[in-house]
Amino acid sequence: IIRGLVGSEMCIRDRSNVIKEFNSLKNDDYIGWIGHATFLIKLGETTIITDPVFSKNAGPLIFGPKRFTEPALNLDELPEINLFLLTHNHYDHQDMSTIRKFPYKQAKVMLPLKLGKYFKRYKDVNEMDWYDEITVNNDLKVTFLPAVHWSKRSLTDTNKTLWGNFLINYKGKKILFACDTGVGNIYKDLGEKYGPIDLTILNIGAYNFYPMAPYKDKSTYHTNPEEALSIARNLKSKKVLGMHWGTFVLSLEPIMEPRQRFKDNAQNYGYKSDEALIFKIGEFQSVSYTHLTLPTTEAV
């Protein structure tokens, strides 16, 4: 219990400060971490949400891992959402309770092939294959790209639906929001074709499944912090922001380990401390694309 309390204080902002900071930035472009893989990203007139999960557990009904930290905002506190991005169908990313209760069903939804059936009450649902591109407006387009991952929600549907990364191109600047991913040569190819990337948001947690998996420090489908940094480097990413840690306990590494390893090893992959970013849950940072000023964070 003590470990949990200390960890929670280290990775989440005080709720009153979250609301205050969010309100102060609501007319600006920003990136904010709600928790796990859920981000709010405002770019011009478009507010984006990624892999929204607001339930108390990541699993069917009341089952699955419980939240270690609460979402930074409640569903009814969200701003109007214009674009809903879903990377894949695992329970800690595709949360049916959130999808049913989501208040902005007029938002444009972009999601992998074969997942549109879960969004029957939504007005604008777009299934995407790898390398599909959708123009949102004159300033913003989104491309769906491969990731080293898999899909499954039941005993009989393994890899029956697609999964992937989203490349957000806003006024010529690029943010790559990653699906859960492992290491693969595909990232060198993507770096050559789409790089340089201005900001990559990558999973850095859920990598120790030993003894269920043969290695204590590696997962085929989830990068550890060092592997995430190597992917960012292969993508020619100028900055990299670690996610997918501190929210649900999905694996056996200590809850705060991903954050520390990510920061400790950044320089080994060519990233300065203000280029390898860690947010607290509930942290919102302004984004200026005029001078390409991407987020910086407090020292950790």
Sequence positions of predicted segments:
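Acidic/histidine-rich helix-loop elements
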Residues: 54-70, 150-156, 209-221
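Active-site metal-binding motif and surrounding structural segment of the metallo-beta-lactamase
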Residues: 62-111, 195-201
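Single conserved hydrophobic/aromatic residue that forms the stacking wall/gate
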Residues: 1-7, 12, 291-300
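Cap/insert and terminal regions of metallo-dependent hydrolase folds
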Residues: 83, 108-110, 114-117, 182-280
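Metallo-beta-lactamase
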Residues: 3, 8-9, 13-77, 108-179, 261-283, 287, ...
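Active-site metal-binding loops of divalent metal-dependent hydrolases
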Residues: 52-54, 89, 147-148, 179-181, ...
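Divalent metal-coordination and catalytic microenvironments
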Residues: 41, 51, 88, 142, ...
